[in-house]
Swiss-Prot record:
It comes from the Bacteria. This is Large ribosomal subunit protein uL16. The gene is rplP. InterPro entries: Ribosomal_uL16, Ribosomal_uL16_bact-type, Ribosomal_uL16_CS, Ribosomal_uL16_dom, Ribosomal_uL16_sf. Keywords: Ribonucleoprotein, Ribosomal protein, RNA-binding, rRNA-binding, tRNA-binding. It comes from Salinispora tropica (strain ATCC BAA-916 / DSM 44818 / JCM 13857 / NBRC 105044 / CNB-440).
Length: 141
């Protein structure tokens, strides 16, 4: 699972990240030929990222390459069940990536476009928001 190696000394539990607005960067396909682009804001957990990656790589089998362009570096906390209110914030439970609309989540290069699109469609079903498949624009390196 993706997550930070070790929280820094004096790690403070963060506030919930802001999901409003569009993505400022990472909104173009840079590494591969195809990409999955988010259309809605969402928190994507490390398990969802891993599940989508497995769905893609199992479909393409060999001959392609997949890049994950997001990283779950935000901790979300949760208090135990049947706990009274107060007595501080809960312990970190999940690691999430704060995704804004327009962000490219995964990129892929594969010789056959049909198989690549089907692999990405399967990965989109594992993600918690609406996404679309984008291609690298002509003229980009």
């Amino acid at each position: 699972m993706l997550m930070p190696r070790k929280p820094p000394k004096g790690f403070r539990k963060p506030h919930h990240p802001d999901r409003s607005g569009a993505s400022k960067g990472g909104n173009r396909v840079v590494f591969g030929e195809f990409g999955i682009q988010a259309l809605e804001p969402a928190y994507v957990t490390n398990r969802q990222i891993e599940s989508a990656r497995i769905a893609m790589t199992r479909h393409i089998k060999r001959g392609g390459k997949v890049w994950i362009t997001i990283f779950p570096d935000q901790a979300l906390t949760k208090k135990p069940a049947e706990t009274r209110m107060g007595s501080g914030k809960g312990s970190p439970e999940w690691w999430v990536a704060n995704v804004k609309p327009g962000r490219v989540l995964f990129e892929m290069s594969f010789p056959n476009e049909q198989i690549a699109r089907e692999a990405m469609r399967r990965a989109i079903h594992k993600l918690p928001m609406k996404c679309r498949i984008v291609t690298r624009e002509v003229g980009e390196s």
